[in-house]
Amino acid sequence: MELAKKEIQNLIQIAADARKSAYAPYSRFAVGAALLGADMKIYTGCNIENAAFTPGNCAERTAVFKAVSEGCREFTAIAIVGGKLDEDALVKTGYTAPCGVCRQVLREFVNPSAFAVILARTIEEYKVYTLEELLPESFGPENLK
């Protein structure tokens, strides 16, 4: 599914809004994600840290787990916005790409050559990749059949 610029910008704004809920007292780096389901619903997520570090969760996985728990298991795109906790979202920070674990979790539910990963610095400044570009030669459910 090809997304129009307005749809991409809407996802970016929703991800920036989700970032405001991030709980990041240790890294002080807040991330928000907006995941577009095949049902056309948008599922949001933010990163949630923990003093023990490993129990924390990334924004992208929070959005995926929320969507799956609500019955959606097919996705079209995700927008990701990140930056230092004390900075406003959508200021010119660097692009925030999903970690390897998040890429693999997304891979479970999407066609990697068609799923759009939108990395945004601002509403106007963003990059769009397919998951396949970010996770080449990936392992997925079809490998277990």
Question: Which ranges hold each PLM region?
Answer:
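Short Gly/Pro-enriched turn/cap motifs at secondary-structure boundaries
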Residues: A24-P25
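Small-residue (primarily alanine) positions within well-ordered alpha-helices
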Residues: A15, A33-A34, A63, A67
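Compact, glycine-rich, soluble single-domain proteins
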Residues: N47-R61
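C-terminal binding/interaction regions
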Residues: E2-S21, C72-K145
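Short beta-strand scaffold segments in enzyme catalytic cores
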Residues: R28-L36
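Short, solvent-exposed cationic patches
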Residues: C58-I80
